[in-house]
Amino acid sequence: MNRSNITQTTPFTIAIYHLLAIYHLPFTICHLPFTIFYRMGFLDGLLIDPKYQNADPRKPEEIDDPQTIISPDTRRDNRIPPGQSRTKKWPVLDAHGTPNIDLATWSFEVDGLVEHQQKWSLDEFMQLPPVRVYADFHCVTRWSRLDNVWGGVSTREIAKIAGVKPEAKFVLASGYDYGWTTNIPIQYFLNEDSLLAWSHDGQPIPPEHGGPVRLIVPQLYAWKSAKWIKGVRFLEHDQAGYWEEGGYHMRGNPWTAGDGERFRWS
């Protein structure tokens, strides 16, 4: 069976998945829609999943590269935020399916409140100074994947090149998937552990997980880490993105007391 068929989801199954998350159902129950609707390929997908984690997550001090940036949340005594459960897999979730991206014409643009608008081709983008970040990954649908190493370019480097103006307080990230956007407070976008990533655990990020380049903002829920990113705009005022317009939290901090900042009414 073609693995792209296994990992593909539909807006219907995504909606069910998120609805179950609202009502605090356990992690295994939240996965039932995918078990039912994965085109009868769910077990095959488990067996061939190259990202399955057999071992316990490493501790930050076990990372052998001294140049790797350590996300501060990995130093917590309990690395699982409120209402979350650990998964050893790397589930695939998206709003519109995986877009077909022509790498020859791929570009990344920076505009808005900047001194110098920027546009890079993929080759140019991957020549930017690289960083490595060790971080955990928390999905609003109540699963957390610990122990990830991302490679790419720091968001701080992008901001420095573009010359972000002082009045910029928010970032609107846009993706190649049918006009998808998400908003991020600039202080989170510019955290030391935030980056525009092209690799995960030493391998190129596969298309179903947001490759060739995706945003990673480890200190917010993962819907803020836009897949298939094509640009960022620096703004003075906050502007709701795709999920935020539907009621998701404008910030999305998983560590807020209670149940995290999942929805605007939470």
What are these regions (language model features)?
Residues M1-T10:
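Extreme N-terminal basic, low-complexity initiation segments
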Residues T9, P33-F34, N54:
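Intrinsic disorder/low-complexity segments enriched in polar/small residues
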Residues A15-F37:
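Arg/Gly-rich low-complexity intrinsically disordered repeat tracts
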Residues G41-S266:
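Structured, non-membrane catalytic/scaffold regions adjacent to prosthetic-group chemistry
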